[in-house]
Amino acid sequence: MAVPKKRTSKSKSRSRKAKWKQKAYNAYIKCVSLGKSVISGKSKSFIYIQQQTEKNL
């Protein structure tokens, strides 16, 4: 027989939402930091293959 579920409290739902937002913010900070290091050329976690190609027109 189907039984209705109890309602989730506001504090629990807000806590879950805050946790999700914090995880997203941490991922954003990590991405921005990595992007800055790649742009500045100080990144140690990537191997850059520099190819010089010449096009004869």
UniProtKB/Swiss-Prot annotation:
Keywords: Chloroplast, Plastid, Ribonucleoprotein, Ribosomal protein. The keyword Transport does not apply. Pfam families: Ribosomal_L32p. One of its GO terms (cellular component) is large ribosomal subunit. The keyword Lipoprotein does not apply. It is found in: Plastid, Chloroplast. InterPro entries: Ribosomal_bL32, Ribosomal_bL32_plant/cyanobact, Ribosomal_zn-bd. Its main location: plastid. One of its GO terms (molecular function) is structural constituent of ribosome. One of its GO terms (biological process) is translation. Belongs to the bacterial ribosomal protein bL32 family. This is Large ribosomal subunit protein bL32c. It comes from Gracilaria tenuistipitata var. liui.
